[in-house]
């Protein structure tokens, strides 16, 4: 079930505060990387153009936010598991 429209998208308060402060900054060229543990935060239009490092449980994955990302969650772009592939050929040798 999706989130109610009247509630609006969820964005961590601390993350939202950092984004708003950086948008208000006079020098837009010095956009620093924002670190966030909040994988469940929804990407909103104010975040476009920022690089947000999302923690995957082990390391920080930098995610550059573009317009296509709006509406998705931050956790979708930092995988937590590594798929190493299936085992090699398991063909039976002669019968």
UniProtKB/Swiss-Prot annotation:
It comes from the Bacteria. GO terms for biological process: ribosomal small subunit assembly; translation. Disulfide bonds: none annotated. Gene3D superfamilies: 30s Ribosomal Protein S19, Chain A. GO terms for molecular function: rRNA binding; structural constituent of ribosome. InterPro entries: Ribosomal_uS19, Ribosomal_uS19_bac-type, Ribosomal_uS19_CS, Ribosomal_uS19_SF. One of its GO terms (cellular component) is small ribosomal subunit. The keyword Zinc does not apply. HAMAP family: Ribosomal_uS19 (MF_00531). Belongs to the universal ribosomal protein uS19 family. Protein S19 forms a complex with S13 that binds strongly to the 16S ribosomal RNA. This is Small ribosomal subunit protein uS19.
